[in-house]
Amino acid sequence: MAEGSGIDRKADERMEFSTSKEVTVHPTFESMSLKENLLRGIYAYGYESPSAVQSRAIVQVCKGRDTIAQAQSGTGKTATFSISMLQVIDTAVRETQALVLSPTRELATQIQSVVMALGDYMNVQCHACIGGTNVGEDIRKLDYGQHIVSGTPGRVADMIRRRHLRTRHIKMLVLDEADELLNKGFREQIYDVYRYLPPATQVVVVSATLPYDVLDMTTKFMTDPVRILVKRDELTLEGLKQYFIAVEKEDWKFDTLCDLYDTLTITQAVIFCNTRRKVDWLTDKMREANFTVSSMHGDMPQKERDSIMQDFRQGNSRVLISTDVWARGIDVQQVSLVINYDLPSNRENYIHRIGRSGRFGRKGVAINFVTTEDVRILRDIELYYSTQIDEMPMNVADLIA
């Protein structure tokens, strides 16, 4: 099912926006003056009308304005900047004109597939330039010429330094999941990429969460940006039920998980752990207990990660155990349950994790395992998102069915 066709319009209409004065709402894609072949691709992809974020952000980005767009997961953020990039590039010029940086390889690959689908009638070239893949293939594709490159900061910086990714025609830089990108791990690599870009490059920052320090940092490479910010109270996903299970000791979590599985019939579920070692340990324990599970984390070779994601997307595997590498923007429609085996160590990641369930307004349930030491973290998450996380009721099976 296409990304756009499942957006929860009621929740979308209720969103509160804090926007710059010049932002107007465009209720239809036709009113945005988009290219004919791009419109065809948008409708073929499953969109009928723009979501709240799309109706505000696309025209501003197409005008060339630096833009900060914040909206929760599942509101069509990826299509917002993909449509904008496709509108501003000139496909007659076989040079890179738009660059997207993402924090994970999976997200960069997903963005590439969205761009290719929306640009289906435009003869667009778009390449996923990511670590863990064959460098020779990157070089071949980039030397051939790509209109849009979607990549991870390390590999993109490397290709620019080697002069295979030519930057002189780049008009737009998109930072997707900017909160994660601008965290310490990627900050230097982004500056590395940014200094190779033409001085007039437009910058678009997109994320579900934008902490104040990130907004502060954007002043370094954005000029008078248009701001389209969802008010924080709206950021916990509507339609998602959130619960906790009090688990006295860490050692008891596994038995709690097994009990939970005995009572639930689940389409698909994701279980989050905070470390790669814990993912491997839990996967082994679940398999020993005769549960069919797959697992994924950043230490795995890219080919293996791709194959696990494909199996999960196609429904061949029903339970995926992962670290936060999976939590950023990966869209699997059937996910009905997210279990935080460990509460996220960074409260910003909470919304990214639970946003995997009930995408585009589909109902979903998030269950948090909370030890005595975790109570403070849970309260912090509740305060930060102005939400309430209740103890799990006995009839939770009815809520997920």
Swiss-Prot record:
Keywords: ATP-binding, Helicase, Hydrolase, Nucleotide-binding, Nucleus, Ribosome biogenesis, RNA-binding, rRNA processing. ATP binds at residues 71-78. GO terms for biological process: rRNA processing. A motif (DEAD box) lies at residues 176-179. It is an enzyme of class 3 (hydrolase). Residues 58-228 form the Helicase ATP-binding domain. A motif (Q motif) lies at residues 27-55. GO terms for molecular function: ATP binding; ATP hydrolysis activity; RNA binding; RNA helicase activity. One of its GO terms (cellular component) is nucleolus. SUPFAM superfamilies: P-loop containing nucleoside triphosphate hydrolases. The keyword RNA-binding applies. Its EC number is 3.6.4.13. It is found in: Nucleus, Nucleolus. Pfam families: DEAD, Helicase_C. It catalyses: ATP + H2O = ADP + phosphate + H(+). Residues 239-400 form the Helicase C-terminal domain. The Q motif is unique to and characteristic of the DEAD box family of RNA helicases and controls ATP binding and hydrolysis. ATP-dependent RNA helicase involved in 40S ribosomal subunit biogenesis. Required for the processing and cleavage of 35S pre-rRNA at sites A0, A1, and A2, leading to mature 18S rRNA. Belongs to the DEAD box helicase family. DDX48/FAL1 subfamily. PANTHER family: ATP-DEPENDENT RNA HELICASE DBP3. This is ATP-dependent RNA helicase FAL1. The lineage of its organism: Eukaryota, Fungi, Dikarya, Ascomycota, Pezizomycotina. The gene is FAL1.
